[in-house]
A protein has these predicted regions:
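Well-ordered alpha/beta subsegment
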Residues: 110-147, 154
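Hydrophobic, Leu/Ile/Phe/Ala-enriched alpha-helical segments that form helix-helix packing faces
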Residues: 30-42, 105, 109, 145-156
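Contiguous interface-forming segments/domains that mediate binding rather than catalysis
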Residues: 4, 45, 71, 83-85, ...
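Aromatic- and glycine-enriched beta-alpha-beta binding-site module
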Residues: 59-107
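Conserved aromatic-histidine-acidic binding/catalytic patches
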Residues: 18-26, 65, 89-93, 137-140
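Short amphipathic alpha-helical segments
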Residues: 22-30, 97, 140-144, 148
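Charge-rich, low-complexity N-terminal segments
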Residues: 1-59, 67
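Short, compositionally biased low-complexity segments
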Residues: 1-11, 76, 117-130
C-alpha cells in the first residue's frame, strides 16, 4: 500500500522547521489539566479515564452525573483543532439514545449560544455550546467549561 509522499514530506518539514511537536505536546498537557481539574471540582460526575485524540480532528473526554447516566446521556469536552474551538457537548451514550433524545428535544427552545444537531444519526452531539475563553489560561478554561457543562446539563430540567 502506498501513501502520499507529499504529505509525508510536509509533515517532516513541519516537524523540522516549526515548534509543531512542542506546541502539540503543550496542547495535550493543557487538555489533560482541564480534565483533571474538572474531575477534582465536579465530584458528582464520573469522568472517562483519559483524553481521546482523534487524528487532530478533535480531542475529547466525556463525563456524566447519575441523572445523565440514567437518561443515557453524557457531557463531552471537545477541542476542534481546525477551528481552534473549545466546546462542550451534550451527547447520547450511543446512537440510539441520541436519536431518541433528539426527537424529544426537537421543539425545545435552547438558550442563546447553544446549537442543536440537525442530524443526530451522523453527529456526535445533541447540543453543543462553544466556550469563549483565553485558552492558555488554564484556570479560566476550567471555570468556563464548568459553567458550560452545568448549562448543558440544565437543558434537561
Amino acid at each position: 500500500m502506498m501513501f502520499d509522499h507529499n504529505l509525508f514530506d510536509s509533515y517532516r518539514t513541519l516537524l523540522q522547521s516549526t515548534d509543531l511537536q512542542r506546541a502539540y505536546q503543550e496542547f495535550i498537557r493543557w487538555f489533560r489539566y482541564l480534565r483533571s481539574q474538572l474531575e477534582r471540582q465536579m465530584p458528582d460526575f464520573r469522568f472517562q479515564n483519559g483524553i481521546s485524540e482523534n487524528a487532530m480532528d478533535y480531542a475529547y473526554f466525556s463525563f456524566f452525573s447519575q441523572m445523565l447516566k440514567e437518561n443515557n446521556l453524557k457531557l463531552v469536552v471537545v477541542f476542534v483543532h481546525k477551528s481552534f474551538q473549545l466546546e462542550v457537548w451534550l451527547s447520547g451514550t450511543n446512537r440510539s439514545a441520541q436519536c431518541r433524545w433528539a426527537d424529544r428535544m426537537r421543539d425545545h427552545l435552547l438558550p442563546m449560544g447553544m446549537e442543536a444537531t440537525d442530524d443526530p444519526e451522523h453527529t456526535d452531539y445533541l447540543v453543543r455550546l462553544p466556550v469563549q475563553v483565553d485558552l492558555p489560561d488554564g484556570d479560566a478554561a476550567v471555570a468556563a467549561v464548568k459553567v458550560a457543562a452545568e448549562k448543558l446539563a440544565g437543558v434537561l430540567l
